[in-house]
């Protein structure tokens, strides 16, 4: 009888522990999902507001864009910063002071912040990586110092407002490098020296900020292996691999379903090959096809969540609020009626 009682107690204890373990696992999975960065690059927002653009919530009521985004699951923002920008509404602004004000506003809404250094006076992307005008004529040592000083200055301005960005991206879509010609991938040694100067400047002010290096065409594993193999070979310092995913910009404009598995495979390969966290730091779909964009975003979120060892950190929609009527941009998540489209629901469903 004593043996039977002991066996029964042992079985009960085992079942109890298993139940607790399963509950903890479920809670852990929920916590991990809650921690996923669901973000938007909303750098156009101040200029949109200054021009008189009115944002409406799902009920058709005027409302602060931050509130609308937060109600749709957005918990993080990405802010680009330019060295000496013009006042052009779409291709200017994003100065240091404007970036700091936007970061303060995001923090007041309880959001995390990513700072995106373009190291240019305007757009930097795969098609152009123009050196800031004030940096022209500098020799390479002077150029490295200018990059360090500028990066430090922006980070210090944020720090003085009590802001330590969760993430800082050095360069924007840099498959060919940045700050051409010195930082072109034709000269990896110089490019990495520039990147590492940025890394050092960020960490000297905000050691907790994670550094992102960003390449476009997140579905193109060959492109990423080539780029990060070279970055590693030359000693680049970074924490996170960032990628863009825009099926609309790919050759032939394929539907997302044709390339989504390639994105997922690349995310996992980057995490495993380099032992780094990964993020989709830019994504977008056609505003004229909000349901399809919704499905695409849900698929991207699932691919990020599926990266082994919880190394998939998040996804950022590029200018979700950047309505075409104001920006002439075809890949926002905002409709002609001034309201978010169905696409934005992907972050709460």
Short names for language-model regions:
Residues 1-9:
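Bacterial N-terminal signal peptides that target proteins for export
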Residues 92-100, 125-230, 234-238, 249-265, ...:
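Active-site cleft segment of glycoside hydrolase catalytic domains centered on the general acid/base Glu
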Residues 15-33:
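Bacterial Sec-dependent N-terminal signal peptides
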């Amino acid at each position: 009888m004593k043996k039977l009682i002991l066996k029964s107690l042992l079985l009960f204890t085992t079942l109890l522990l298993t139940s607790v373990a399963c509950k903890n696992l479920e809670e852990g999975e929920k916590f991990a999902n809650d921690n996923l960065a669901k973000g938007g690059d909303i750098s156009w927002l101040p200029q949109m507001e200054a021009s008189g653009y009115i944002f409406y919530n799902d009920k058709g009521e005027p409302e602060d864009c931050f509130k609308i985004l937060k109600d749709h699951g957005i918990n993080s923002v990405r802010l680009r910063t330019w060295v000496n920008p013009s006042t052009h509404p779409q291709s200017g602004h994003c100065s240091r002071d404007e970036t700091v004000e936007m970061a303060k506003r995001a923090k007041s809404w309880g959001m995390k912040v990513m700072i995106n250094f373009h190291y240019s006076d305007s757009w930097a992307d795969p098609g152009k990586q123009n050196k800031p005008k004030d940096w022209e004529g500098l020799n390479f040592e002077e150029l490295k110092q200018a990059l360090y000083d500028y990066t430090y200055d922006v980070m210090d301005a944020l720090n003085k407002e009590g802001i330590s960005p969760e993430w800082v991206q050095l360069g924007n879509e840099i498959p060919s490098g940045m700050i051409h010609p010195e930082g072109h991938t034709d000269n990896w040694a110089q490019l990495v020296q520039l990147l590492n100067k940025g890394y050092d400047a960020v960490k000297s002010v905000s050691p907790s900020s994670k550094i992102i290096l960003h390449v476009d065409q997140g579905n193109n594993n060959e492109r990423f292996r080539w780029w990060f193999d070279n970055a590693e070979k030359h000693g680049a310092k970074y924490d996170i691999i960032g990628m863009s995913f825009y099926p609309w910009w790919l050759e032939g404009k394929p539907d997302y379903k044709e390339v989504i598995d390639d994105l997922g495979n690349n995310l996992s390969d980057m995490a495993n090959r380099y032992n780094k966290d990964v993020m989709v730091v830019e994504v977008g779909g056609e505003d004229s096809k909000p349901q399809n964009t919704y499905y695409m975003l849900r698929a991207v979120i699932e691919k990020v969540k599926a990266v082994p060892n919880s190394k998939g950190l998040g996804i950022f929609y590029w200018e979700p609020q950047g309505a075409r009527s104001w920006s002439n941009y075809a890949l926002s998540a905002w409709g002609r009626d001034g309201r978010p489209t169905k696409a934005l629901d992907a972050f709460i469903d």
